[in-house]
Each structure stands twice: as structure tokens, then as C-alpha cells.
Amino acid sequence: MNKAVAKPDEVLSTLNGLIETCRDGQKGFADAHEKIQHAEIREFCLEQSRNRARFVGELQQEVQHLGGDPENTGSASAVLHRAWINLKSALGAGDRSIIAACENGEDSAVSEYRKALEQNLPANLRSVIEQQYLTIQQAHDRTKQMRDSLDPENRL
């Protein structure tokens, strides 16, 4: 049984929610880049911040194409807010704490993208969101690997 394509206002709400999610990630990774000492991880954080900025632009373009007003701020969602507040709190700590907070933020981003992909979106939007989701999922996995590599006992 095929579900009906999501209503335009639902699609716009989903896209704007993902814009907020990406803005949160962009800022979180930028903050981490400024504070992390480990060169490889610093570069990774910068790359992820840039990826999220690119995703914001892509999603905003889709919102405009649908006749909507793209979100211009970060998230008010409590889940994402807590994840990135944890990053802020960790900024006074070592690299492992900071990258662990990034991983928490990535957990939230992966979850938001999965929710979006559960909707019956138009094919062109689904393609954009799936590509971004795959990049975010890979970043999440890499973030976890980096966190584990910084753990002296390498606990999972």
C-alpha cells in the first residue's frame, strides 16, 4: 500500500527542521574545531562544519523552491539543544570530552534525518535528504572512532 506524498506544509516543516539540525551541527563542529588540540580531529571538525553549512544551503534552496521561507536559525528542540549544550560544557575539557559531545550531537542529527526519511517525501527531496543522511551517518561513525581512539583504555 502506497502512502500519499506528504502535504506541502509537512514537507516544509521537515526541511526547516533539518536546516535547524544542520545549523546546530555546523556551530557545534566549529566550536569543537576551535578547542580541540589533535590536528586530525580539528580538521575533521572543520570539514564537518563546512558540510553542515553546505547542507543548510541545499535545504534552504529546496524550501525556497517549494515557496516557503527557509529557517535561518538553529534549533529550539530540547534534544538538540541539550546535545550541543553538552558540547559547550565540554569545551573546557580535553579532546575526548569534546569529541564525545560531538558524537552526542551526531546521534541527534542521525535521529532527525531518520524521522525525515520515514515520511513519504517527493523523490527529488528524498534523494537530497538520503545523501545528506549518509554523510552524517558516516561522520557519526568516524566521530565515534575518534572518541574511542582518544580513550586510553579504548572502551566502547
Name what the model sees in each region:
Residues 1-156:
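Amphipathic alpha-helical hairpins
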